[in-house]
């Protein structure tokens, strides 16, 4: 009897060690350890052995509004449950972002350091949008990327995106975007000679064909391409194919299942066409966006935890679709991690990243509406009233009940 008991105990210990060993192996898996230093070869993203790499992951929303969703716990959940291999930290420059509040870069640092600890790649995104010409804040961009590349240039995890979405008919690749990149890239290369740099292209990073005709000389540059499945279709896929034929390396650093406004839809059939297109061409991508904002491109439902552990009910239709697509191609099958504990489930989570909808007593604190300015979610003063943009708009006067402006007082 004693012998049988001893054998049983040994078997139990062996089984326990096997389970622990497998769990540790899954938790310790690092896509960065697997692929190492990324580079460009023949217009394609490759690992340190020269093998093609396709990264898939999520982009944050604006860190100044929804930064509470960008933290070690949420990124770990995305790695372990979704299977992401890249995370994009979207630091708006205007709209209450870095130019007005430089402290938002601390959230970028938090994202980068979490990604390093978790062994995934991370995109540091200089998110120009309403400031449509990257040259508007060129000097600030140079200072910012000098700091980031000095801090993190030794880590192969890091990817720099130096101009999210240049836009406007007077902002072209040849005259504005490429000259800007030719000033910012050397600042990064002074500290970081190797890591990938993504450069935005014209018309909200759609005009990759123009960049392909006049490429930058840095060997490890990629060109940003963005699309929204409910708005963009075959004509833009043709532009990507043209750019690839010219040997340009393309990174889809932002895409959504919605219309280009970030809302409307979702368009899952159209999104699947795009997913297939990107897979067939081995294009890396980051989906917009990790937030609980009440818009269809958001991955989470209102009220979702900012630290991961999301149930199916907490995922939006877009989030459910994107999670499934990432999990389908994960190098290591994602585990089913234990949701992080909530120390006080009765208390609602704070939402410090969202703008305060309550206007100040003095409307003069906000600028007057300007028909020539591009707005995305800014607050303006017009006809004795404060208004906030609900989506991208230009030359649409506040006051139209079906328009993009919402009254605040």
Swiss-Prot record:
InterPro entries: CBM5/12, CBM_sf_5/12, Glyco_hydro_5, Glyco_hydro_5_CS, Glycoside_hydrolase_SF. It comes from the Bacteria. Substrate binds at residues 61, 65-66, 92, 127, 228, 260-261, 288, 293-295. The active site is at residues 165, 254. Belongs to the glycosyl hydrolase 5 (cellulase A) family. SMART domains: ChtBD3. GO terms for biological process: cellulose catabolic process. The lineage of its organism: Bacteria, Bacillati, Bacillota, Bacilli, Bacillales. Residues 334-343 have a biased composition (Pro residues). The keyword Hydrolase applies. One of its GO terms (molecular function) is carbohydrate binding. GO terms for cellular component: extracellular region. Residues 326-372 are annotated as: Disordered. It catalyses: Endohydrolysis of (1->4)-beta-D-glucosidic linkages in cellulose, lichenin and cereal beta-D-glucans. Keywords: Carbohydrate metabolism, Cellulose degradation, Glycosidase, Hydrolase, Polysaccharide degradation. The keyword Magnesium does not apply. This is Endoglucanase B. Residues 344-354 have a biased composition (Acidic residues). Its EC number is 3.2.1.4.
